[in-house]
Each structure stands twice: as C-alpha cells, then as structure tokens.
C-alpha cells in the first residue's frame, strides 16, 4: 500500500472529524430562511434545518441538482431551480417535502459552463406569493442578455400554470421586488458565477431601483467594485460587495443614499445572502462553507451549526468504463500488449488473447504517460501519488506494488522514454528541463534546459549512448541537439536558420531523421482576395552521423553483376549489435543532410521503423473548424523507395520499442498493425469496451484539488502568484474538500481558491457531474 501523500495527509484530521457523527457539515450553499428554518443545497439536493442549528432533513433527491431554494412569503412552499428531468426548470415543493411541481417548460440552455451559472435561476417571489421571480435565457443568446420573469403558481396541483411574463427591464441579473411589489431592485449585469474576486471594470455590477410605472431607474450603489445579491428590507437595500477586498454585507439607505458596511469578514466571502422577507430583519448567507444569519437590527452575526445526514450515494465506490477517457497509450515490444492510461489508472490490454490488467488501482492518484521497458518486463509512468509528480515503475503483470523511482521533483512531468538497454529513463518537465534517471538508483542528472517552452521530442540512439531532441536555438527557431552520455557534451546539429524538430534514430545508429520547416510551397487563394496560403512546408530529412556513410537512398543505376562464388557465402544480417556507443562525427554534421523523397506537407509525427520511416500527415489548419482532410499514417520503405498509407482518420499512434508494430488510434478505435508496406492488411482491432477502472470520489476529490493547485503553481504567468501566498491559500481551502458530495461543489471550491489570485478568465469547467440526460426539444421559431 502506497504511503499517504503529504498534501492528502493534511486532510486526514478533517476527514476524521467528518467521520464522527454528529459533526458540523460544510459546503452548505444557496441558503434562504423563513421563521425558524433555513433551506439550502448540499450535495446537489435541497435540505431544511432549524435556524438554531441541528440535523437537517432532506427535501429533494434526484440525479440532477436542485439549487436556489426560496421560501414563499407564507413559508409553506419552496421554489427552486432543478434538473429533475435533465434541464434546468423552475419547480415548487412543500416546505415539508413531497412531490415537486414544474412551473416552467421552455427548453433551457445548457449544460452551461460553470462561469455562466444556470438557466432559469430562481430569485424569490412576488410579495403576495402568487408568482415566482426567476432569471432566464429564453430570449437571450448570452448571459448579458438575460431577463427577469415571473411565473404564476397554478390553481390546482396537477394543473399547468400560465406562461412566464418578462419584467420590463431589457436585461437583468439578480433582482428582488420592493415590499409593496411596485418596484424592483436589480442588477443589469450577471457575472455571479465568474471567479473574479476584487474585480474592477465594466463588468462590475451596480444595483438599480426600477419603477415599471415610470420606466425610471436609479443607481443606488454606484461603485467600481462588485455590488450583487440585492435584498429589499423595509427602507434599505442590502447587498454583498467586495469594496474592502472581501465580499461582505452592506446596506444603502434609500432616503439619503448613504452606504454602510454591515459585516467585517476578511478571510471568507459572504456569499449568496438571502433575507427572510421584506418585513424580516434577518439575512442568511454562506461563509467558508458554513451558514450564518445576520440580525439587521442588532447588526450581529450568528453561526449555524448544521449536520447533514447525507448517505453519500454520490461518493460511493463504483467501477466505471474508462474506454472513452484514455489519456495516453503505448505498445509493448512485439506489439502483443498495449498499455493505456485512462481516468488516472494504468491498464494493459492484449492484442488478442488474455485479460485486461489494471496495474495501479489508484483512484487517489493521477497516473499517466505509461511506457513499456525495452524488454517488456516493466512499465514506467508518471504519478502524483506521493503529492508531486514523480516517475514510478510497475511490473508488467501487476504482481508487485508500484515502486517510486524519482524523488524531489516539483513540476509537471511529460512522457518518459527508456534507453534501449533499459538502464536510463529520460523525462522532461513543464519548465523545459530534460533529465536522465538511473533506473537502478533513481539518481537524476540534467541534460538540457529549454528556456522558451517545453522539450518533449527526446529520443534515444539504439546504442543508448546518445539522446537527440530539439530546443530553441540562438535564432529562436527549433534546432536539433545531441547529448552524449559518455562525456556529458551537448551538440547543436542544425543550421542557425533551420527550423527542425521530431528527431528519430535509425536502427543502426547511422542516421538521424527529422522534420524540417525548410521548404516553401505557397498556394493561391482567390475566394475573397488574391493572397498566399503558406502551409504544407514540412519535409522529412536525414542527417548522416558519420562522414563515411553513403547516401541513404543512393543514385540507382542498372549494372551487370555476377552471382556470388560458391566458396563465398551470402552475407547474413542479424541486425545491429552495440557493444559500445556509436561513433558520431559532429564536425560538419549539420551539412550532411539528405531529403527523403516524400512531398512537403503538414507532418505531425515521425519514427524510424523497420527498413524505413513511419510518419503522420494531417490536413491544413482552419480557424473554427476541423481540417477538410483526415490525418493519415504512412510507411516509407527504403528498400522499395515508396510509401503506403496504413490508416486514415488517425488522431495518434505509438510505435513499439522494437519498431515492429504500431498502435493506431482512429477516433475511438484502436488497432495494432505491422510496420511494413502491407501493414494496412491484417490489422488487429483492440477491444476496449468496458475498460474497468475504480471510481472512488472520496479519494479522487482531494487528488483533483491538489493537482489543480499544482497546475496553477507551475503555469501561472508570474512566479509570485500576484503577490498572494499560494501555499497558505491551499491550506485555507483544503479542509472543505472532505465535505464535497457533488462534483459541482468541488468545482466551486477550486474556483474560489483560484479566484483569490485576482485574475480573470481562470475558470474551472467540466467534471463527472452525473447529470441526467437533457431532453431534446424542437422549437418552431415562432413567438
């Protein structure tokens, strides 16, 4: 059993607290109150609890989420936004629980990105309790065109109500009616789900009081920072604002327009405040995952300790099919097995006979970039099960536990590559540092440091004595380099004005093939203007590593030859044997270049294999759509001096370590082919159906949290993280992870942590939410 990683170990005390019932539950969201009860969302469902705290009672349970619950003025009914049938609609349910009734039926927009929030978001009720107030996209293309609507409750339980009625404001985000129902306080902007803390700019919402009778609108907050979540309580407008750096409660006197700060939180935002009604002087909100209520008269805050007896159905361990979640793949020597990294696990699949093997079974780690050793006995891969990405080794049968090979690395790692003798592994990181790792000892040494990006095309010579790769040269173009292990020397082997990448050694160690941007093959475009389109300019080239080598494709000439004498046996070729490193004549190497006779094109992959070259050709690149030509995989034979297409629609491929077979990916199909001119025939399709991977959200959620934290640490555009203590922010938000019961809550925690960096367009999206299928509805285009 692997040791608990240090970042995960920090969560164990909190996990222990959660396990001891009754304990306070956190991540209670979107609260509302009436009388002596609060309603809120936890784990995607609605719950009700006493205002004084205690144990919550479940109100809803569905595959989708239920959000934005609002008590009716009499407290008997709760309106909410729900996904009961797949898309977001407005529902009502008794405050004691029971069957929910659907009020809206117009097809909602979605699923929307997290930063957009939800369609048909409920905001409250009309003061007389006859209709529900909500915001909808039904007449808008984007969120900046939303409107507020009311929809009346039907007279009978099984009767459908009237159609929604739009309020007269042309665009609107959050809103609430005045106590007499004659005016509305609202925000014309909606960006309540965008993770922009302390934002100042054109998208900072202000609050307006609108009078439908006169059409007059008055800005009552008028500040450069965010003013949101309006509540109309007697003669004051209450709202949330981050004017002091953190969202707090503020209020505005409607008579003299004076504004005052009501709460003083400096660590956690006051989020989604909601009042008990226009005559109730209490406001409930979430802060740090907990619920609090504020007495508007005494101006005092009261914490609410609530225990949610959630059965944890959404975080139970299950087995899922990961065949559609393949992240990386490789082929074994001889092509008899393939290794896949899918949904964080390392699995091997037979070409034809045998079982599927999950070698890591690690729902709490992200395992990726798995590759077979040259002898097929081990598999190297990258994993963060120690808390940072390191190189790990596992037996190809999975009979022994995985072994951590490297220690102390602190950056995202890319694909490792084995030396042919199995003694070394080369691996680079996001900083462009290329290292060699001794397989026996785990010791590391730096080979190169790319200062302008990543270094990911490193390849080994067949003798294991040299490593070739491309990195930025003095002219800011990619240049080929060769590193010699014997004397630890690094040689640039490209011309200064060449743009070369994708090197690959031939099996004899005599040549280094590569892709070079050395041609110019413009096409004319005449559809809108007479202009040049310059693509298809990459060629395939070869460098002769020794001065005495003949051309790879010598000039052919027909000559009369005599058969070999009987006492002179025909030479037998058993393939190259390397007892010592191959010799490379670096003097003049950049000039010993030969172009392989394949046309200039858009190439995206090159490997020396068999008696020739394997390469992938793709179509032209277009803005906003896929290429008009499918990517194809080809093999060029040196002996036959011709090329044959092996597959079409190829999204990727992986060559076996011995170069005899190739794993080809075409869409969701995987096939193994021999690397020959006739490799198109006899391809064997792999069966990935039902690829079994354990799903254990209780372990996956902490891993996702810490990996997201590392991604920002590694890739944020300035090293000082905008001056914030990024480690301290992880410590602040990590305890919330043990309370996550739904993937949307994990996204919320991640978004809040990242928002602390005070940067725009840094969003969290996606994830396995388990949302039900959305209904398909056709609209006639009529109103």
Question: How should these model regions be labeled?
Answer:
Residues 15-23:
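Hydrophobic h-region of N-terminal signal peptides that target proteins for export
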Residues 24-49, 325-347, 597-618:
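Beta-strand-rich domains and repeat architectures in extracellular enzymes and scaffolds
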Residues 24-28, 54-56, 310-326, 582-599:
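A short helix->beta-strand "capping" segment at the edge of beta-propeller domains
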Residues 32-35, 69-77, 123-131, 175-183, ...:
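Blade-terminus and WD-like Trp-Asp/Gly-His loop motifs, strongest in beta-propeller folds
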Residues 41-47, 61-66, 79-95, 99-120, ...:
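A flexible loop/linker signature enriched in serine peptidases of the S9 family
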Residues 155, 404-407, 422, 620-622, ...:
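Flexible, low-complexity junctional segments that flank or bridge functional domains
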Residues 260-274, 491-502, 600-604, 642-653:
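Conserved blade-ending motifs and adjacent loop-strand segments that build the rim/top face
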Residues 332, 588-644, 727, 731, ...:
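Long hydrophobic segments that form regular secondary structure
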């Amino acid at each position: 059993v692997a040791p608990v990683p240090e970042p995960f170990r920090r969560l164990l005390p909190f996990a222990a607290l959660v396990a001891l019932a009754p304990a306070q539950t956190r991540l209670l969201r979107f609260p509302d109150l009436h009388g002596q009860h609060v309603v809120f969302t936890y784990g995607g469902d609605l719950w009700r609890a006493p205002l004084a705290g205690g144990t919550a009672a479940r109100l809803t349970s569905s595959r989708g989420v239920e959000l934005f619950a609002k008590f009716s003025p009499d407290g008997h009914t709760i309106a909410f936004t729900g996904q009961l049938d797949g898309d977001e609609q407005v529902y009502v349910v008794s405050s004691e629980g029971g069957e929910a009734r659907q009020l809206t039926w117009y097809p909602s927009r979605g699923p929307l990105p997290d930063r957009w929030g939800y369609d048909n978001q409920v905001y409250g009720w009309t003061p007389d309790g006859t209709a529900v107030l909500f915001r909808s996209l039904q007449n808008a293309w984007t969120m900046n065109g939303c409107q507020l609507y009311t929809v009346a409750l039907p007279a009978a339980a099984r009767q459908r109500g009237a159609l929604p009625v739009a309020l007269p404001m042309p665009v609107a985000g959050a809103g609430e009616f005045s106590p007499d129902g004659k005016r509305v306080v609202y925000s014309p902007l909606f960006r309540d789900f965008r993770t922009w803390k302390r934002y100042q700019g054109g998208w900072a919402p202000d609050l307006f009081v609108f009078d439908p009778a006169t059409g007059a609108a008055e800005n009552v907050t008028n500040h450069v920072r965010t003013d949101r979540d309006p509540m109309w309580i007697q003669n004051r407008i209450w709202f949330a604002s981050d004017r002091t750096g953190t969202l707090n409660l503020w209020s505005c006197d409607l008579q003299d327009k004076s504004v005052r700060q009501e709460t003083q939180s400096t660590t956690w935002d006051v989020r989604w405040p909601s009042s008990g009604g226009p005559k109730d002087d209490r406001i409930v909100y979430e802060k740090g995952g907990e619920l609090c209520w504020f007495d508007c008269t005494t101006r005092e805050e009261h914490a609410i300790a609530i225990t949610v007896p959630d059965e944890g159905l959404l975080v139970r361990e299950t087995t899922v099919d990961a065949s559609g979640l393949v992240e990386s793949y490789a082929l074994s020597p001889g092509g008899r097995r393939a290794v896949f990294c899918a949904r964080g696990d390392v699995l091997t699949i037979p070409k034809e006979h045998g079982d599927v093997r999950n070698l890591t079974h690690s729902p709490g780690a992200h395992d990726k970039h798995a590759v077979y050793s040259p002898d097929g006995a081990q598999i190297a891969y990258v994993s963060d099960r120690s808390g940072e990405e390191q190189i790990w080794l596992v037996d190809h049968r999975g009979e022994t536990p995985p072994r951590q090979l490297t220690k102390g690395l602190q950056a995202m790692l890319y694909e490792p590559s084995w030396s042919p003798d199995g003694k070394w592994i080369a691996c680079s990181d996001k900083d462009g540092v290329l290292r060699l790792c001794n397989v026996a000892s785990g010791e590391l040494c730096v080979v190169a440091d790319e200062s302008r990006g990543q270094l990911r095309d490193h390849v080994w010579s067949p003798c294991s004595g040299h490593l070739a790769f491309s990195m930025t040269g003095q002219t800011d173009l990619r240049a080929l380099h060769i590193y010699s292990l014997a004397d630890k020397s690094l040689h640039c082997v490209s011309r200064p004005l060449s743009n070369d990448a994708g090197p690959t050694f031939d099996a004899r160690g005599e040549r280094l093939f590569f892709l070079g941007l050395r041609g110019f093959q413009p096409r004319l475009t005449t559809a809108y203007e007479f202009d040049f389109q310059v693509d298809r300019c990459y060629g395939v080239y070869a460098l002769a590593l020794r001065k005495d080598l003949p051309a790879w494709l010598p000039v052919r000439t027909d000559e009369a030859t005599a058969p070999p004498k009987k006492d002179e046996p025909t030479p037998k070729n058993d393939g190259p044997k390397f007892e010592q490193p191959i010799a490379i004549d670096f003097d003049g190497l950049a000039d010993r270049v030969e172009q392989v006779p394949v046309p200039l094109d858009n190439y995206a992959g090159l490997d020396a294999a068999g008696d020739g070259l394997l390469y992938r050709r793709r179509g032209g690149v277009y803005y906003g759509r896929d290429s008009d030509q499918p990517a194809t995989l080809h093999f060029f034979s040196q002996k036959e001096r011709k090329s044959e297409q092996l597959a079409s629609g190829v999204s990727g491929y992986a060559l076996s370590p011995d170069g005899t077979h190739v794993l080809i990916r075409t869409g969701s199909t995987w096939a193994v082919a021999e690397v020959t001119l006739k490799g198109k025939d006899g391809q064997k399709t792999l069966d990935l159906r039902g690829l079994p991977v354990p799903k254990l959200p209780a372990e996956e959620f902490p891993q996702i949290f810490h990996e997201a934290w590392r991604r920002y640490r590694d890739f944020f555009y300035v090293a000082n993280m905008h001056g914030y203590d990024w480690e301290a922010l992880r410590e602040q938000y990590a305890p919330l992870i043990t309370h996550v019961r739904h993937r949307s809550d994990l996204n919320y925690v991640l978004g809040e942590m990242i928002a602390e960096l005070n940067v725009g367009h840094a969003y969290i999206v996606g994830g396995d939410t388990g949302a039900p299928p959305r209904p398909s509805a056709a609209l006639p285009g009529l109103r």
